[in-house]
From Swiss-Prot:
Residues 29-76 form the KH domain. One of its GO terms (biological process) is peptidoglycan biosynthetic process. This is RNA-binding protein KhpA. The keyword Cytoplasm applies. GO terms for cellular component: cytoplasm. A probable RNA chaperone. Forms a complex with KhpB which binds to cellular RNA and controls its expression. Plays a role in peptidoglycan (PG) homeostasis and cell length regulation. GO terms for molecular function: RNA binding. It is found in: Cytoplasm. It comes from the Bacteria. The keyword Chaperone applies. Forms a complex with KhpB. Keywords: Cell shape, Cell wall biogenesis/degradation, Chaperone, Cytoplasm, RNA-binding.
Length: 76
C-alpha cells in the first residue's frame, strides 16, 4: 500500500526525496501518515482538497483488495 501511495505522490510533488510514509496498525483500521516537503503540501492536498480526496479514494479501493481498512492522514 505504501509503495502505491509513494508512486502516486512522487509524480505530484517537486521534492519526491522528502516523501515519508508511515503505517500505524490499529485493531479496526490502519492509518497511513504522509509527510511531504512544506512546499509540496498544497500540491498533495489540491484545490478544495480534491487531490487528497482522490488519494483517499484510491487507497480505499486498494484496501478492499487487501482486505484491510486504511485511512490517510496528510501531515504538514
Amino acid at each position: 500500500m505504501e509503495e502505491l501511495l509513494k508512486y502516486i505522490v512522487a509524480s505530484l510533488v517537486e521534492f519526491p526525496e522528502e516523501i515519508v510514509i508511515r503505517e500505524i496498525e490499529g485493531e479496526e483500521q490502519n492509518i497511513i501518515e504522509l509527510r511531504v516537503s512544506p512546499k509540496d503540501v498544497g500540491k498533495v492536498i489540491g484545490k478544495n482538497g480534491r487531490i487528497a480526496k482522490s488519494l483517499r479514494a484510491i487507497l480505499t479501493a486498494a484496501s478492499v483488495k487487501a482486505g484491510k481498512n486504511f485511512s490517510l492522514e496528510i501531515i504538514d
